[in-house]
Amino acid sequence: MKFLDLAKVYIRSGAGGGGSVSFRREKYIEYGGPDGGDGGGGGNVYIEVVEGLNTLIDFRYQQHFFAKNGQPGMGKQRTGKDGADIVLRVPAGTEVLEEDQETLIADLEEVGQRICIAKGGNGGFGNLHFKSATNQAPRRANPGQEGVERTIWLRLKLIADVGLLGLPNAGKSTFLAATSNARPKIADYPFTTLVPNLGVVGVDGAEFVIADIPGLIEGASEGRGLGDTFLGHVERCAALLHLVDGTSEDVVGDYQTIIAELEAYGGELALKPRITALNKIDAIEPEELAKKRAALGKVAGNLMEMSGVARTGVTEVLRVLRARVDADRKAARDALEEPDRWRP
């Protein structure tokens, strides 16, 4: 399935049906009086989070969504039928933005969440509504209210527990394939991964989700390479796993390149808990490994070592990540359970 994380959508709710001007016509009833019914309400436009989606690709093929108009009222006090609603189905993690792409309307994080993005117009009153003591036979009715037209943007930020970062060919996809059922494309050339991949990882009976983000390069924040387009997908993560290619000639420079791009991106991304791992240690001579370990340890602090191919040190890395994820989940639960303090 192709990946799309940004879509522009034009929506319109249904207009209300017009009221009816009608009079009761029956045998032997000379002055039947007004009996025009009200118009039906226009359909609403909803956005709903559903299970099983992880892309906005459906909105590439259809960008216009119109709810149905309400039916007009009829004689014999019959109200018109309401217009059918329309529902836009999106994956969890979708942000709904105004046309300026900056004003946030809603952040939809959980399956089942549903918001009304455009309310249908009200139906107009029939002439029965305008009958009074001084006007026994009104010949007026209200037209239905117009629907709402608006343009919105849908922006997907994948919901994962851990974000996987590194330069191209750092071994991110190999790590994801070795630890989960995900099958990302793996090859010996840069930018093998062009879109984010998700994988469910299990360790010691616990599971969490890792997002493999396409490789960053120096200047990504300025649009070089694939740019920093996909960094938004790790903003929701509890922790980041930064893989450094152990076979690189300058492991310190590679590490600092990614850190600089995180800081250039802005927000709280650079402040997130981060685990740094020297990858591909099975392809390095012991003496060279010791030198690179010492050099990288000076700038990265606590450094872990692993090999996605040989699976050396992988379990240890997963356990550290799991501890970070568990701590984040516990903090989220505690925040929900904490009662509001009583204030006089």
UniProtKB/Swiss-Prot annotation:
Give any GO molecular function from the UniProt entry: magnesium ion binding
Q: What is this enzyme's EC? A: 3.6.5.-
For the ligand (Mg(2+)), the binding residues are: S173, T193
A Pfam family per the record: MMR_HSR1
Give the cofactors, semicolon-separated. Mg(2+)
One GO cellular component term noted in the UniProt record for this chain:
cytoplasm
Ranges for domain OBG-type G: 160-326
Predominant localisation class: cytoplasm
One GO biological process this protein is involved in is: ribosome biogenesis
Q: Where is the signal peptide?
A: none
CDD domains according to UniProt:
Obg
State where the protein is found: Cytoplasm
Residues annotated as binding GTP? 166-173, 191-195, 212-215, 279-282, 307-309
Give the stretches traversing the membrane: none
Where the record annotates domain Obg, the positions are 1-159
Q: What class of enzyme is it?
A: hydrolase
Q: How does it assemble?
A: Monomer.
Biological role? An essential GTPase which binds GTP, GDP and possibly (p)ppGpp with moderate affinity, with high nucleotide exchange rates and a fairly low GTP hydrolysis rate. Plays a role in control of the cell cycle, stress response, ribosome biogenesis and in those bacteria that undergo differentiation, in morphogenesis control.
Q: Which PANTHER family match?
A: DEVELOPMENTALLY REGULATED GTP-BINDING PROTEIN-RELATED (PTHR11702), MITOCHONDRIAL RIBOSOME-ASSOCIATED GTPASE 2 (PTHR11702:SF31)
The UniProt similarity line reads:
Belongs to the TRAFAC class OBG-HflX-like GTPase superfamily. OBG GTPase family.
Q: Any idea what this protein is called?
A: GTPase Obg
